[in-house]
Amino acid sequence: MPIIRGTPMPTQQENRSNKPVRMVAVDMDGTFLNDDKTFDVERFERILTRLSRHGIYFVVASGNTYTKLRQYMHGFEHRDIIYIAENGAYVADDSGELAVHHFAAEDLPRVYEILNGMPQLGIVVCTAESSFILENREKTVMNIIRDYFEVQGKPLPQNIDPFAFASMFYPGTERISSYEQVRGVPIKFSLQVTHRDIP
């Protein structure tokens, strides 16, 4: 249960006065974060302190993983921030996991079948435990990396490891040889293509 200044967020049943729960929710990429993936820490410290003083929740909402969001908010641990990660599939706060919305197990074989038929896609399988990339997608991932640096106008680093690169965006990414090795039930399939593949 999210906590602000020692007071649990009331459930709808507990909130008999119908007093609205106040919160500020922000997206990260292109909104809260600058182009270099940073933010004004001192200014945010002042804002967060003021929000907390008035009983207003600060919510980070993003398609990023929970681990990545915690990296962005390093230094603000135990400040009662609520995280809505993986496009809403994973919700947590400083006390831990609050809600997880995963794919139905009976749907996964068909999802895997469809993805196996699309070799041009870079695929990251995200669960509440970790993120996973298939080893047989290494060539595809490398093409996407080259495209990324080309679009950014940056030189491609020498001896780049596709899995190390993926870990920049999906911390703790693990190599797997088949979908059967995914730990946990998927909550998101992140699909990547090169800009040339976008019609």
Which sequence ranges carry the predicted segments?
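Short, Lys/Arg-enriched N-terminal segments with co-localized hydrophobic residues
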Residues: M1-P8
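Active-site phosphate-binding/coordination module
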Residues: F39, F44-V151
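Extreme N-terminus of proteins, especially the signal/transit-peptide cleavage junction
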Residues: M9-R22
